Each structure stands twice: as C-alpha cells, then as structure tokens.
Design a protein with these regions (language model features):
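Hydrophobic faces of well-ordered beta-strands that scaffold small-molecule active sites
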Residues: 1, 17-19, 46-50, 76-78, ...
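Conserved anion-binding
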Residues: 53-140
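Acidic (Asp/Glu)-rich catalytic clusters
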Residues: 5-13, 32-42, 67-70, 91-99, ...
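Conserved protein kinase catalytic core
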Residues: 26, 55, 170
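Short acidic active-site motifs
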Residues: 2, 6, 58, 62, ...
Length: 178
C-alpha cells in the first residue's frame, strides 16, 4: 500500500518516480504491474535507478531478468565505465519489449569519495551528448557549482537530474551527501 499512497501523494508535483525495484521487500510481478499501471494512470514516468554498468550484451540481458525492467521502466541510470555499448544494450532491451526508454548517464555523484572525476565527467558528457539513447545526465545535487558546470558542458539539449537533493544540507547515512 505504501507505494500506491506515494503515487497519490506526489503525482501532482513530480514527473517521475525513482525506484530501486530490487529493494521492494514484497515484490511480485502482479503487484509491480499494478504499481506501474497506477503510475501510468497518474501520468508519471518510472525511473529505475539501477546504475547499469556492464557491456552491452549483459546490460541487454539485465533489462529482462527477474524484474523485466524493460517492460515497465521509462528511464534507467547507467555508468559509462564499460563504454557506450552499455547504452546500446539498454536500448536493445527496450526494443526487445517493443518499448522506448531513455538512459540517464551518471556524470557526477553526491556520495562521499566517489571516483567520478572531472575528466571522467567530460568524457561521459561528450559520449552521452552524441548518443540518441541518452536523454540526460545525473549531476551532483549536493554541489550547485558542479551542477552549474555540468549544465555549461551539456548545453540545453539534454536533461540534468540531481538525486541527492534534500532540504537538510549535510551528510546522510553511509556516505550520502545532501
């Protein structure tokens, strides 16, 4: 019931729901299908924050898997550490399900000690801006100056999403920064 209450509460104020499907304790295909239907009826995108990072062939297979992410997600996150084929694999996964979706590449992270340095960020932006399957980038919501620099690098053609935003600035649990 909690997820359905969430849809009802936030639908008028947000465009997408960020999920971590593998953290849903009582997950079942039937219940998740009802959740996705309710989100769709509320005109909400479902954004699975899976952070795919493997080669294209494996990423494509992961889009099916036990959770069949390709059948219900509108957006997914991915690291570009394995190269641009990860995006091709994710797009192929959606195509296998006769759907379309978009990839948000992690250009920055708000977690303490992460290894996404400025050189990596530049390469992610360069590669992502050239790929039609990439709809945007994840920026560091805890550092406005970094998000501003990311916007300058990305331009206006792609979105920047900033998880890690919280009304209380500071450190959260296990390295999360707000």
């Amino acid at each position: 019931a909690g997820l359905f209450d969430l849809i009802e509460t936030v639908a008028p104020y947000v465009a997408a729901l960020k999920t971590h499907v593998d953290l849903v304790d009582d997950w079942s295909p039937e219940a998740w299908g009802r959740f996705c239907k309710a989100a769709n009826e509320a005109d909400l995108l479902i954004f699975e924050d899976r952070k795919f990072a493997d080669i294209g062939k494996i990423s494509r297979a992961q889009m099916s898997g036990i959770y069949d992410v390709r059948s219900w997600s509108d957006l997914v996150t991915a690291h570009l550490i394995s190269g641009p084929d990860v995006v091709d694999g994710l797009q192929a996964g959606w195509k296998d399900a006769n759907r379309e979706g978009g990839v948000l590449l992690l250009a920055q992270m708000s977690s303490r000690g992460n290894l996404l340095n400025p050189d990596y960020t530049r390469e992610v932006v360069r590669t992502g801006c050239a790929h039609d399957g990439v709809v945007g980038f994840i920026g560091n919501g805890s550092r406005p100056e970094e998000v501003s620099a990311l916007r300058d690098a990305v331009g206006e053609e792609k979105m920047i999403w900033t998880p890690g935003v919280n009304l209380a600035v500071g450190d959260g649990e296990m390295g999360q920064r707000y």
